Amino acid sequence: MASAPSDIPENAFRLAKASGRCQSMMSQMKDETKCMGAVFSGYPTALWLEYEVSPQPMSGTLKERLKKARASSQPFCSVVKRIKVENEENDQTLSEPGESSKEENCSKAQESLENKDNEPEKESSEDKNTSESKSLDTGSSSVLQKDSTEKTIKQTLKEEKAKLTRQVQEKEDLLRRLKLVKMYRIKNDVTELEDLIKKWRRCGQRLLCELQSIMSEDEDEKLTLTELIDYYGIDDKLLHYNRTEEEFTGV
């Protein structure tokens, strides 16, 4: 019984040749060989032995059996074909989400590439903005530094100018005095000048002594010469006054 399905196609070909239907059945049997194995698996082996032993024209019963077998085999093959078509449709439906996912992945990859391409441009624009802001900051700081340095330089120049003007005035005064002394020495004799100075010193000393006597009589207290000199703001060296002894020297 297990070897009968494998011998079915050969017996069917022999029977078709004997009946004169070889050309019409060849095209159908090529597609239905697989189905026929399942259909003819239920027939007894004696029937197939009868086909092999007697290569005679088929009887009516055999023809009817063949027709029944062909009729029963057609829907089975149609079921198989339908299953194949459904499987192909399922494969297509399964493949379509995969393709859509692939398309989504491709679109995501393209977007990521575009974002990566745009990132350097953004970074370059940000770098440009930062460099421009830094250059502006450095420029403003340099301008402020220049202004501060210029102000300090101007201030120092003003101070030096005022100092120089004071020194010039002092030198001019000293020069004027020296010129006066020279002029007096040219016009007058030095000995005469010394005599005049001595006379003026003696007059000053006498005047202070008289003031001391007058003021002490009014106040009933004797005033010292140092108090009178300090009161009038007279230089001790000009009058040759000695504070320790409270006397005039060289009188």
UniProtKB/Swiss-Prot annotation:
Species of the source: Rattus norvegicus (Rat)
Protein name: Swi5-dependent recombination DNA repair protein 1 homolog
Chain intervals with Polar residues compositional bias: 136-146
Basic and acidic residues: bias regions: 99-135
Location of the protein in the cell: Nucleus
Entry annotated with the keyword DNA repair: yes
UniProt-annotated stretches for the region Disordered: 88-150
GO terms for MF: transcription coactivator activity
Entry-linked Gene3D superfamilies: 6.10.140.1020
Protein family: Belongs to the SFR1/MEI5 family.
Keywords recorded for this protein, A-Z: Coiled coil, DNA damage, DNA repair, Nucleus, Phosphoprotein, Transcription, Transcription regulation
Assembly behavior: Component of the SWI5-SFR1 complex. Interacts with RAD51; the interaction is weak. Interacts with ESR1 in a ligand-independent and ligand-dependent manner.
Coiled coil: 149-202
